[in-house]
Amino acid sequence: MASAFSAFRVSLSRISPFRDTRFSYPATLALAHTKRIMCNSSHSVSPSPSPSDFSSSSSSSSSSPSTFSLMETSENARWRPMCLYYTHGKCTKMDDPAHLEIFNHDCSKELRVAAADLERKKSQEFNFFLVIDLEGKVEILEFPILIVDAKTMEVVDLFHRFVRPTKMSEQAINKYIEGKYGELGVDRVWHDTAIPFKQVVEEFEVWLAEHDLWDKDTDWGLNDAAFVTCGNWDIKTKIPEQCVVSNINLPPYFMEWINLKDVYLNFYGREARGMVSMMRQCGIKLMGSHHLGIDDTKNITRVVQRMLSEGAVLKLTARRSKSNMRNVEFLFKNRIK
């Protein structure tokens, strides 16, 4: 499987956008979203204390934030929001210079790492990490995932879908989306692209299979990969709840995961209750719109890259019981509760 990822690539470049005028990203939406992002990006964060490596060599893993060069590359001089039609394969503006100037169509550029960042990276138990951060409290509204190569720390590909609730009235959905995504300026793209969770799962499984990360004959887990979450809620609670609502079985690859909060606690010796506090403690600037799932997933990925570059080993922190999948075993004695 590793040979499939021997060269860095982002598979979204293979997508042929649909030629449908419904999916033309309006300039007013672009400006609203960009303005929101510029406001969010202005938050500064404090430098990170020296980490304490729980695995073996705590003294060798301490560093100042300036040694991590992810956000210092020229590509990040002017951060741009992702074209959310493009992430769904529905961008019709790929030949429009003005659109390409405003929107990013390749998140790998803003998440690149330098060769120096690999110097202290340790061998990992998995070859790939799938960073996921769901959005939606009543039902799942957004399902974003980034693949991170554990060896190179590069982003290999992304999967992003907006999810249409199945048990809510149209009136309730409209009110929900206006409140959730309206203030971020992406409510229209949500309505244009959202699909039912069952269809999201079907498309996600095709995507996993294309990357040799899962096959239908496997009854447990992923192939040499692990999900990374910021908390247990996404996979422990929300996905099973959504499967019940959508009347589908819980997919067998959602049986174990890495809660980054627990790894962070044991590696650095300090608590971080969420993504923002992790970034603040590590001296990483918040980019994009907080609570837009794709942006949060990218920010969590940046924390993952930082931790890997400083010598952290990302191990499984939770696993479902095979005899009763409602029961979850937490694998770290020292964990965030």
Curated annotation (Swiss-Prot):
Binding site for Mg(2+) 1: D133, E135, D296
GO BP terms: regulatory ncRNA-mediated post-transcriptional gene silencing
Residue ranges crossing the lipid bilayer per the database entry: none
Biased composition (Low complexity): 42-66
Positions of the UniProt region annotated as Disordered: 42-68
Entry keywords, A to Z: Exonuclease, Hydrolase, Magnesium, Metal-binding, Nuclease
Binding site for Mg(2+) 2: D133, D234
Domain Exonuclease stretches: 129-304
Name under which the protein is recorded: Uncharacterized exonuclease domain-containing protein At3g15140
